[in-house]
Design a protein with these regions (language model features):
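Bacterial N-terminal signal peptides that target proteins for export
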Residues: 1-8
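Bacterial N-terminal signal peptides
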Residues: 8-16
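A cross-kingdom marker for long, charged
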Residues: 188-220
Length: 220
């Protein structure tokens, strides 16, 4: 995070109970949130951004757990693992699409929005982003996820796995479901989790309450 943005946000939270609420402090919050969401996007856009982080890794859908166990025992461990990897790769490819949407939400954040975030819960900023961006993120992520899943072979792997399972368990056929929607939803869950972690850093910075920082902000 840029030092200037960090300093402004530190003071912003330090002035939570003050009657004064300078516009420059609100601007500092917006800048810091822009950097924070950017960090979240950058982290998840990397190779293994999702797959290598247990907190956001996209696992098999619950309804596929039994299917996976049967297939693993039948010698299809690699196919199951490849399928999980391909879902996460699709999420990683879609993640960069979130950056301009978050940036737009920050630009549109009003003075009143900033006040609510300051005085709200520990997840107020993350909740703001969820409210303002979830629908648009879903619309943007899903086609990218779909294309990525096809390129990574996830859709093909899913069909192959279900076909194998159905041929092995004729009386336990697995129902089909919207795989793209599932991966998109999990990708966004992970994105907002990372945004929440960035918000926590902003709120709990141990240097946030020093007089020196106040002097830096106000040029005294």
């Amino acid at each position: 995070m840029k030092k200037s943005a960090f300093v402004l946000v530190a003071v912003f939270f330090g002035l939570a109970t003050s009657p004064a609420f300078p516009q420059d402090i609100a601007a500092g919050l917006k800048e810091a949130l822009a950097v924070g969401t950017g960090n979240a996007v950058q982290t998840l856009s990397k190779s293994n951004g999702y797959f290598g982080d247990a907190a956001v890794k996209i696992l098999l859908p619950e309804k596929m757990q039994t299917v996976a166990e049967v297939l693993k025992k039948a010698g299809y461990q690699k196919e199951v693992d490849d399928f999980v990897l391909s879902m996460n790769r699709a999420a990683e490819q879609a993640a960069p699409k979130a950056r301009p949407i978050f940036e737009d939400a920050v630009r549109k954040m009003s003075f009143e929005d900033a006040q609510k975030i300051l005085k709200g819960s520990s997840t107020a900023a993350t909740d703001y982003f969820k409210t303002k961006t979830s629908s648009q993120l879903t619309d943007v992520f899903k086609p990218v996820v779909s294309d990525s899943m096809n390129q990574a072979g996830a859709t093909r792997s899913y069909k192959a796995l279900t076909d194998r399972y159905n041929s092995m368990v004729p009386f336990g056929k697995m129902d089909t479901f919207d795989l793209d929607r599932y991966v998109t939803g999990k990708a966004l869950d992970g994105m907002f989790l990372k945004v929440g972690q960035e918000e926590a850093k902003i709120r709990t910075n141990p240097t946030a309450r020093t007089t020196d920082l106040l002097k830096t902000v106000f040029g005294k």
